[in-house]
Structures are given as structure tokens and as C-alpha cells.
């Protein structure tokens, strides 16, 4: 379901813009449709009031909690079941943050990512994206949403921008606390500056070498790292939000002194933050995370050379922390043949 479809249905029930906003705000913020001045029964059209119970049940069914996996760091990884029975992952982050998925699967095919191994199964509608926030708000407050879960937001741009617009208006989330994460796509840099709600931007860089980037992200748009940084810098200066560059640290792949010097050349003097994220090793893939001391040394090197850098850990690292790992494990278990129960012998 898309937000636009939802608003069209509300209008067909006689809703004016003020009625739409009352209903949407109550849904996204999990609040009452009554306010201090006027009860919903005295404000909403009769046809809309009569349709609300069924509509509310339908919205609640867009995203249901299948399982919750608390992490030792205070985060929690959520396996979310959609209305068609498919599952995606969301992650409750520290300091009232939430990471949401935008696609079921992913077409980019990052070689180090579990989500990309399945390819793209389907897009999530904008209402399904927002429903992950609504579900999370039933568990904790959510004041920041990062679009960094399963999927590539740039490949589902209309739905993601529609979700961002609702979250940044009726959802009550500050624009800079909505973070659009992408491997880089020219359409993103064309459309984001024109939006009513302009999110912060996170760019997945992972290497300063164009040839290695093409190997690691085989189906991403072939934008050279230097051009990607230039596009990011333009957006950062126009919005006043620094670009967050994402760098998954993989031992022996992109953790060399040459790569760190490349980061310095690209980012020194830029309105930017480099997030170094040690890779979450999984048995199915050959990549490995560098040691803690080595990762700390890399972040310190960047600091000394004028690049603001943070060493981050994937939230919920101890509970299938890499993107798509939890879903992959559950899908694998669901596909496992079930053993019939033995019938006890009769006397």
C-alpha cells in the first residue's frame, strides 16, 4: 500500500485535508484522533468514522512483529511480517532511533551483504515503510529514522520519498533525523533537493578505488568515488546537513593505508563524517572483520589527518547483526523439512 492510495481512500470517504491529517497523524504517532478542542466523532465525516475500524485494522496488519531479538548494546533487531507473509528487518537503535527496510531483497548485489544474495523480491509500499515506524513506536519512542535496512532506497525512490514526507510532517520527526542511505544514484541528487522534507544523506562509499567499488557493488550505478563525494558535498552545503559516508571495514579488502590516504584526499575539508563500520562476519561469506585495535587505529589516523571519523558497531551485532542475516536464518529454518511426530504406540 502507498500513502497516496490511503489518502485517496480517505478522500473518497469525504475527508478534507484537515481530516486526512488528523487520521494520518493518529496512525503514525500512535495517538488519539481526539484533540483538546474537538473529539473525532464531532469532526470527522460520518462515512469516514464508519470506515475507520476496518481501515485501522488494515493499517495494523501492514507490519506485525514476528520476533524481537534484544542486543547486548541496548538495541533490538525486529523481524517484521508484512501483510503478504513476507518478512523484513527493522532495528531499534539507541537514543530513540530506528533503522527500516525499503525493499524485500536488494538488486545492488553488494558481495559482502546477505540481503543482496536473494536479489530483489519486491518493493515495499510507502505505507509498509511507515508501518515499520508505527510498529516500533509501540515498543519505544522513535525520534530518528534511518533508511539503511534491507534494500536500496534509490531503487524505490517514489515510495521512500513519500514515506519520508509523511514522517517529516504528520510523523513529527525532524528532517535532519530522517537519513536517506544510498550507494549513490543520480536520481537521488536530482530529486532530494526538490522535496518539501529534505532528509540527511548517507552515502555508502566502502572504497576510494573505482575498480574495487565496481567489484564490491557490482550492480550499483558506476559513479566514481570522487564524483560521488562532489555530489554529496553539493547536497550537504544546500541543506546544512553533513554527509555521512559509510565504510564497511573488511579485513584485507579496504583497510589498507592506501585506502585511508584516499579517504583523506577525498574528504578533508568536506562537510562530512566518515562512519567506519567493522564487517559482521557470517559463515556463508568469506569476508572477515578487522581486529578491534586495527579498526581503532584507522579511525585515529583519519582524525589526525583532518577527517572527522567515527568507529561504529552494527547495532545488535550479537543477534545476526548484519543486514538481512536474521531474515536469512529464519527463511532457512522455514524451508527446512519438518519431521513428522512419532505416534505413541497404543496399548
From Swiss-Prot:
Cofactors (names): [4Fe-4S] cluster
InterPro entries: Aldolase_TIM, Methyltransferase_A, rRNA_lsu_MTrfase_RlmN/Cfr, rSAM
Record carries keyword Isomerase: no
Residues given in the record as [4Fe-4S] cluster binding sites: 106, 110, 113
Enzymatic class: transferase
Keyword set, alphabetical order: 4Fe-4S, Cytoplasm, Disulfide bond, Iron, Iron-sulfur, Metal-binding, Methyltransferase, S-adenosyl-L-methionine, Transferase
Transmembrane segments: none
Domain (Radical SAM core) ranges: 92-318
UniProt subcellular location: Cytoplasm
A Pfam family reported for this protein in Swiss-Prot or TrEMBL: Radical_SAM
Coiled-coil region(s): none
GO biological process: rRNA base methylation; tRNA methylation
Disulfide bonds: 99-323
Record's GO cellular component terms: cytoplasm
EC number(s) recorded for this UniProt protein: 2.1.1.-
Similarity comment: Belongs to the radical SAM superfamily. RlmN family.
Stated name of the protein: Probable RNA methyltransferase azo0122
Organism of provenance: Azoarcus sp. (strain BH72)
Lineage: Bacteria, Pseudomonadati, Pseudomonadota, Betaproteobacteria, Rhodocyclales
Amino acid at each position: 500500500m502507498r500513502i497516496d492510495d490511503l489518502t485517496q481512500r480517505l478522500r473518497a470517504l469525504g475527508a478534507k485535508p484537515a481530516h486526512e491529517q488528523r487520521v494520518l497523524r493518529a496512525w503514525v504517532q500512535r495517538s488519539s484522533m481526539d484533540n483538546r478542542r474537538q473529539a473525532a466523532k464531532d469532526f470527522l465525516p460520518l462515512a469516514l468514522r464508519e470506515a475507520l475500524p476496518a481501515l485501522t485494522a488494515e493499517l495494523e496488519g501492514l507490519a506485525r512483529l514476528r520476533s524481537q531479538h534484544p542486543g547486548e548494546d541496548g538495541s533490538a533487531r525486529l523481524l517484521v511480517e508484512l501483510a503478504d507473509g513476507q518478512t523484513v528487518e527493522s532495528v531499534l537503535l539507541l537514543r530513540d532511533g530506528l533503522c527500516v527496510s525499503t525493499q524485500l531483497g536488494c538488486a545492488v548485489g553488494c558481495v559482502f551483504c546477505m540481503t543482496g544474495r536473494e536479489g530483489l523480491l519486491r518493493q515495499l509500499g510507502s505505507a509498509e515503510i511507515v508501518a515499520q515506524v508505527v510498529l516500533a513506536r509501540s515498543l519505544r519512542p522513535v525520534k530518528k529514522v534511518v533508511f539503511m535496512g534491507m534494500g536500496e532506497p534509490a531503487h524505490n525512490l517514489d515510495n521512500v520519498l513519500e514515506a519520508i514526507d509523511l514522517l517529516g510532517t504528520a510523523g513529527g520527526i525532524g528532517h535532519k533525523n530522517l537519513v536517506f542511505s544510498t550507494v549513490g544514484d543520480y536520481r537521488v541528487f536530482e530529486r532530494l533537493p526538490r522535496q518539501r522534507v529534505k532528509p540527511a544523506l548517507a552515502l555508502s562509499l566502502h572504497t576510494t578505488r573505482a575498480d574495487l567499488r565496481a567489484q564490491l557493488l557490482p550492480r550499483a550505478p558506476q559513479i566514481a568515488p570522487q564524483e560521488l563525494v562532489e555530489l554529496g558535498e553539493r547536497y550537504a552545503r544546500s541543506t546544512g546537513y553533513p554527509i555521512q559516508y559509510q565504510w564497511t571495514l573488511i579485513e584485507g579488502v579496504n583497510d589498507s593505508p592506501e585506502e585511508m590516504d584516499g579517504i583523506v584526499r577525498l574528504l578533508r575539508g568536506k562537510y562530512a563524517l566518515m562512519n567506519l563500520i567493522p564487517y559482521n562476519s557470517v559463515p556463508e561469506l568469506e569476508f572477515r572483520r578487522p581486529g578491534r585495535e586495527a579498526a581503532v587505529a584507522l579511525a585515529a589516523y583519519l582524525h589526525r589527518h583532518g577527517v572527522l571519523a567515527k568507529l561504529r558497531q552494527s547495532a545488535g551485532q550479537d543477534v545476526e547483526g548484519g543486514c538481512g542475516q536474521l531474515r536469512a536464518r529464519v527463511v532457512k529454518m522455514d524451508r527446512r523439512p519438518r519431521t513428522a511426530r512419532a505416534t505413541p504406540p497404543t496399548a
